[in-house]
Amino acid sequence: MALINYASREINCKIVYYGTGLGGKTTNLEYIFKQLAPGIRGEMISLATETERTLFFDFLPLDLGSVQGFKTKFSLYTVPGQVEYNASRKLILNGVDGIVFVADSQREKMQENIESLRNMEENLAEYGLTLDSVPYVL
């Protein structure tokens, strides 16, 4: 559930992009970054390896203005796609308000997509969450 701070009149919402390695999660955030005016978006932070793969996460803060007098902010994160970074994937899901699952469109990546989706469900379960309790987009 989004964090609502009544004292500062702010709503903060955490959206996590989840999926396989090189499936398009970072590309999604880069596209959003390029489409929004600098006053709306913050600086995009990306921790990538030498091969340009996400090492820990990408982060893009958005300030979407006011909703009924509350300043509305979104924090967009990507998880690393590689299974060996599962601890990072799990940590980034902590406090999630919504998920965008980015499936790789290549036919030969279908099994990896399924494994990544199952991994996401397992990691959500660590926080007592299911796909029935968190809004998501596939």
Model-predicted regions and their roles:
Residues 2-51:
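Conserved G1/Walker A P-loop phosphate-binding module
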Residues 45-85:
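Switch I (G2) and immediately adjacent beta-strands of P-loop GTPase domains
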Residues 6, 65-68, 123-131:
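Alpha-helix termini
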Residues 85-108:
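Inter-motif core of Ras-like GTPase G domains
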Residues 97-101, 125-138:
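Conserved beta-strand/loop subsegment of P-loop NTPase cores
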Residues 27-32, 95, 112-120:
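Alpha-helical scaffold elements adjacent to nucleotide-binding pockets in ATP/GTP-utilizing enzyme cores
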Residues 108-130:
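Amphipathic helical hotspot of TIR/SEFIR-family domains
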